[in-house]
Amino acid sequence: LALAVSHAALPAEMYWRSVFPNTAMPKALRNLLLPAAVNKNMLTDMAKSKDKTVDAFGNYGYSNPSKEFPDGNTPTNNDVYFFESELHPGRKMKLKELAKKVSKATFVPRPVAESIPFSIQKFPEILKYFSLEAKSAEANLLKQTVENCERPAIDGEEKYCAASLESFIDSGVSKFGKNIQLLSNELEKETGNQEFTIGQGVKMMGESEIVCHKMKYAYAVFLCHSIDETAVYTVPLVGADGTRARALAVCHKDTSAWNPKHLAFHILKVKPGTVPICHFLARETLVWVPN
């Protein structure tokens, strides 16, 4: 099943211009517009992947403690989560997320997204729409994303799932108004290198933001959430092969509401609510911040 959607009218771009008439659409968003398609084949590739990072960052382990350490493969280094004091020039880190390839999932137009079932209550309809068996790996992937989108917000969190560019824009404007900017990870070129060194010019962009994690689905779905007392940074990086990048990192100042079995506490050997915990954002994560 691969249902292509005509992009002749460019409705998503027109919506962007209506909201931000004096601002060009960022490249990170333009890349999510073509081809506008629902693609079941992509699900198969995602289901085969053992990568759990996006799921972990989108959920922060707030839900089921039994899922905190998937497949028993718990990272043992501090490069996934780290302390705020480590965010300084010269610090070397292995950033697997920044080096991995982007997914091909793109936004579908808002009318299409709204016509496709998207809830646990309607999960049998979702399976029927994508012609999937209930126990297939692809079905499990869809279910995880829908469950993540429907999980209750924790204390200090506002959350929303966007399945079209229009709803993605709305998620930012509804909280901050139109005087906002969109931040994204920037990589000079594709690289297999995973080791980067933090350069000069680490910049704190504020403590009010909406972090939007790209979830695993047959089209682009972003889990957007704002968590109290969270700072976002832009971090210049240089890879061991010379590749330059600008990455996004967040530091959570208050983790007292997090699940005590969250992976971050296991890696850093600290308890909830004791110290700020930081992590770089996955390559396709987008962040709204006020200007």
Residue ranges and their predicted role:
Residues L1-S167:
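Intrinsic-disorder-preferring feature that marks N-terminal prepro/targeting segments
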Residues I116-N291:
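Folded, disulfide-stabilized extracellular/luminal domains of secretory-pathway proteins
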